[in-house]
Amino acid sequence: MLWSSLIALVLVARNAEAIHTLRFACSQLVTERLDPLVNPGKNPSPHMHQIVGGNAFNTTMDPSNDIGETATCTTCTFSEDFSNYWTAVLYFRARNGTFKRVPQIANQNLAQAEGGMTVYYISPDNTTSPITAFRPGFRMLAGTAENRKPESGFVNLYRCYDSYDENMFFKPNPMGIAATDTTELPKSFCGGGIRVNTFFPTCWNGVDLDTPDHKSHVAYPDRGAPCPATHPVEIPQVFIETIWDTEKFDKSLWPEDGSQPFVFSQGDPTGYGHHADYVFGWKGDGLQKAMDARCDVYDASPEPLIFPPEGCPHLKTQSQKVANQCSQRQVAVEPLDEWLDALPGNMPITYS
């Protein structure tokens, strides 16, 4: 994602302030049907997820346990980030009715990552506005799995790439929000993949680490306004970026009527129901120090998508090769890369 595009998107949520950004890769940890936030203790959960981050991810993830202290490795570049981030999984539905998982590909200037996602933490330029880092036990949910229609504002934004080169420079990738960006899955063939950005809320009520719906304790500011009185504490803007490798699925496999063939694992063929989960797991006060220092990709490098370690001396990093070695075996064991007669869990496809 181009730096200027990032600014254009996030200023909407940051009241038109300049911003500072951490951008880093998190390789794949595991892909399986577990969801300790929405379906704690249920093995398997109803639909498939792809998970990145620390290896403390499990079926329950008791909020009283600090996963920043219990995890022993992380798939993320910042070695103190043992948080877990996960989303639904994209599947291709062929004209014969069978399904195949769409793999993820690495992002621009993060080509050594094995699948996974790119994670962003954003803070405003105004250092007099305190940004409160999350606390152990904090978790939240962005998006609604059951959505099949557009809503006011957006949680997800899609971009259709035509191609990419050996350096993972994707095309087209215009500055700002492109006229072709959508809040639903693209309807045309995307030879360079489908990128989806998912944005988490930036305001917290300052009390609850979670709520039964995993949403009520946090809020999005209204059209760039300050945080509302009900949720007065400003927290980092977290958003995650996933690129699905749709190039692998030639148009000869598409439905004969040419209709959009991709569907998310909860049975969503629209993209409006894409959603993401976040469980905080940074070790110690590293994230708070980074937010206080307004660590920034752009300030640290002439190339804004490369983040050298000296860009945030408050945080420890690890090589992507080391990060790629962190993984988990499936707890809910089932095939991942075979052609399937139905979505995992026999999830029905719904349009409303």
Language-model-detected regions and their locations in the chain:
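Primary mode marks residue(s) on the alpha4-beta5-alpha5 output face of response regulator receiver
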Residues: 19-45, 50-198, 205-352
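Fungal secretory targeting signals
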Residues: 1-21, 352
